[in-house]
UniProtKB/Swiss-Prot annotation:
Function of the protein: Forms part of the ribosomal stalk which helps the ribosome interact with GTP-bound translation factors. Is thus essential for accurate translation.
Gene coding for it: rpl12
Protein name as it appears in the record: Large ribosomal subunit protein bL12c
Sample GO molecular function, one term: mRNA binding
Source organism phylogeny: Eukaryota, Viridiplantae, Chlorophyta, Ulvophyceae, Oltmannsiellopsidales
Keyword Oxidoreductase: no
C-alpha cells in the first residue's frame, strides 16, 4: 500500500474533533489557512496566432484578517475594531473570541493597509488577504 493510501485510510478513522485538531496543526506547521479559497487570480489571454499568454489579474479588493490579539492588548484592539467597523461591543468581543477571523472584506488596498496599521499599533497580529 502506498504512503498516500495509508494516510487516507488513517484519516478515515479520525473523529470530527481529531480532524479539526489535525487541520489546526497543519495550519500552524505549514503557515496556511484552510479557510482561504484556493486558485483564482489567474487570467488566460489568447495571443495572436502565436499561442496563449498568461497574465496575472491585479487584485483590487482585500480582506483584513485578525490572526491574534495578546491578552494585555485586548482592550486597545477592541476600541480600534469598534472604530473601524459598525459592530457593537458584544459583537466585537464575540469576534475576538473566535480568532483568526476576517474583520473587513472586499475593501480597497488603502483601506486595508490603514486598518492593518491601526490594528497592529494597538497590538493585534493582522494580515491582508
Amino acid at each position: 500500500m502506498s504512503t498516500t493510501s495509508e494516510i487516507i485510510e488513517k484519516l478515515k478513522t479520525l473523529t470530527l474533533l481529531e480532524a479539526a485538531e489535525l487541520v489546526s496543526q497543519i495550519e500552524e506547521t505549514f503557515g496556511v489557512d484552510a479557510s482561504a479559497p484556493v486558485g483564482g487570480g489567474m487570467v488566460m489571454a489568447v495571443g495572436d496566432a502565436g499561442g496563449a499568454a498568461e497574465e496575472v489579474a491585479e487584485k483590487t479588493t482585500f480582506d483584513v484578517v485578525v490572526e491574534d490579539i495578546p491578552s494585555d492588548k485586548r482592550v486597545a484592539v477592541l476600541k480600534v475594531i469598534r472604530k473601524l467597523t459598525s459592530l457593537g461591543l458584544a459583537e466585537v468581543k464575540a469576534f475576538t473570541n473566535s480568532l483568526p477571523g476576517t474583520l473587513q472584506e472586499g475593501i480597497s488596498k488603502e483601506e486595508a493597509e490603514t486598518a492593518k496599521t491601526e490594528l497592529e499599533a494597538a497590538g493585534a497580529v493582522v494580515k491582508i488577504a
